[in-house]
Design a protein with these regions (language model features):
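C-terminal output/effector regions of signal-responsive regulators
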Residues: 131-192
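C-terminal output helix
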Residues: 86, 104-113
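Receiver (REC) domain switch/output surface
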Residues: 22, 109-121
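Conserved acidic segment of CheY-like receiver
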Residues: 2-14, 19-23, 50
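Short hydrophobic/Thr-rich beta-strand motif most characteristic of the beta2 strand and flanking loop
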Residues: 27-35
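Conserved phosphotransfer microenvironments
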Residues: 16, 37-39, 48-69, 83-84
Length: 192
């Protein structure tokens, strides 16, 4: 795998240095950072991936992870000494790609990170696909609504209503969904 720019946030400075050395031996560049102000640190350093190590995740850290991963999604691996079911669910919901309990060994970190990156990429692809499907469905609904308005107002068949939308879109160099949204907006305005 290509070298990465990795942020390590660890309360234990000696352990952070050990992790840094292990990752740099693989050709990665590493930035060490405190756990405090994690969201801002991630925003500034723009790492390819982040590794957090702490005794236990607290609510503040989970909230900062949620903000940081929402702003700029990236693979995040968290190593903790202990975690309960609720903490694990909250961490995953906050965007953590992998949560490892009592398993921090420097020689395993890159392999765990690689798996987390692969999982993150698969999850991101699924998320993008879902967003695209939702957007397409929303466009389809607007087009159907606009066709209904044209069918009612101009006594057109469904096929002719669609052709009218398509012609208007082509004439104006716009997407059919944009023209349909204009039709719906005007119809809503005229109802008032």
């Amino acid at each position: 795998m290509a070298p990465l720019h990795i942020l390590i946030a660890d309360a234990d400075a000696a352990r952070a240095k050990t992790l840094q050395g292990s990752l740099e031996d693989n050709g990665d560049t590493v930035v060490l950072a405190p756990l405090a102000d994690l969201a801002m640190t991630l925003r500034r350093s723009k790492p390819d991936a982040a590794i957090l190590a702490t005794e236990a995740l607290d609510r503040r850290t989970i909230d900062e992870l949620r903000v940081a991963t929402k702003e700029a999604p990236r693979p995040v691996v968290v190593f903790v000494d202990r975690a309960d079911d609720t903490t694990m669910r909250d961490a995953i919901a906050a965007g953590v790609s992998s949560l490892v309990v009592a398993g921090l060994a420097p020689q395993r970190v890159r392999a765990i990170l690689d798996v987390a990156i692969a999982r993150f990429q698969a999850t991101e692809a699924t998320r993008v696909e879902l967003e695209t499907a939702r957007a397409n469905l929303a466009e389809r609904k607007v087009i159907d609504r606009a066709k209904g308005i044209l069918m009612q107002q101009r006594s057109l068949s469904e096929d002719d209503a669609y052709k009218a939308l398509r012609k208007e879109a082509m004439d104006r160099g716009r997407k059919i969904a944009d023209v349909a949204q204009s039709v719906v907006s005007v119809a809503d305005l005229l109802k008032r």
